[in-house]
Amino acid sequence: MKNNFLRLILLLFTTAMFAQVDKVSVVSNDEGMKLVVNGKDFMINGMNWDFIPIGTNTVDANFWNKSDDIIKAGLDTEMSLLKNMNVNVIRQYTGVPAKWIKYIYEKYGIYTMLNHSFGRYGLTLDGVWTPVTIYSEARTQDYLLSEIETLVKEYKNTPGLLMYLLGNENNYGLFWQGAETEDFPDDQERINFIGESRGRPMYKLMNEAAKKIKLMDSTHPVAICNGDVLFIDIVAEECKDVDIYGTNTYRGASFTDMFKVVKEKLNKPLMFTEFGADAFNAIKNSEDQKSQAYYMVSNWKEIYENAAGLAKEDNSIGGFTFQFSDGWWKFGFDDR
């Protein structure tokens, strides 16, 4: 009798724990491609979010290492503003404790897309910092797949987790040497060479990571974050197990043929992981919120017009405005 009672308690506890975890899936039907959460269609009204006070950067802000009272105060201030503007998902990088993903979701109804940078900004391998990630190396592959496994174990049962995101325009990182924007080579042969020699191993490894995630967690989809559509043909060949194509795209007021190209090349849902415009007008050397609003409204209009069932490309599942706080800390960041 006692054993039966203990089994019942364990069953109720397990059921309650997993009942809190949302079932998120990608659905493709006659209407098009869409994201579905717990059986309901879900359009991402997203925001790139982090908490970096004035005078700090991503390295020394250490927000998640503060006391719970400080973290809660910061989240309550930020998330109340985001909720008021109908944001339903924020993009966060790894490092956020699972309990705060849960807190944000349960108090404000805002999900988290959890982003592993996947070597975008370098790795520490065998105790040595390597600023440029070589994805064809066995030790790099082992390290990243091990990190992904640890990540999924830690977060897969977290209420408020929407999906996993791999990378941050890592295809650009194949050319750039740091976090700041640099020029691309003009030589198309050089670009193609980089794509084949460095890009293909990276995308292949991303696909291996996606397979590992989905083997461990069947309730949350996996996306990659690519820079625009550079190397999309390689993505089509190597990333067949990735659920969603995420892209950082800055083309001005219109995404032009982005929806059509992604549909024809990949036949996967399209998610804008970054887009938008600055509030600072470099020509006028002054703040210009009206100009920013013009670009943002135009971009969001296209994102919605291309959602499932609206008779355009039917493959848009939403996007993440870039970004909630200013990024002035990035200037000179690589000169530390």
List the predicted regions and their residue ranges.
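Bacterial Sec-dependent N-terminal signal peptides
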Residues: 1-20
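Conserved Rossmann-like nucleotide-binding pocket used by diverse enzymes
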Residues: 13, 17, 43, 271
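Short acidic, Pro/Gly- and aromatic-enriched capping/linker segments at domain boundaries
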Residues: 20-34
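Active-site mouth of glycoside hydrolases
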Residues: 30, 36, 40-245, 251, ...
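Short aromatic-enriched loop/helix-cap "lid" or pocket-rim segments at secondary-structure transitions
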Residues: 125-127, 175-179, 283-285, 329-335
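Non-catalytic scaffold segments within catalytic domains of secreted glycoside hydrolases
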Residues: 223-242, 247-260, 278-320
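Aromatic-lined glycan-binding groove of carbohydrate-active enzymes
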Residues: 261, 268-277
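Aromatic-rich peripheral "rim/lid" segments of glycoside hydrolase catalytic domains that contact
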Residues: 315-317, 322-336
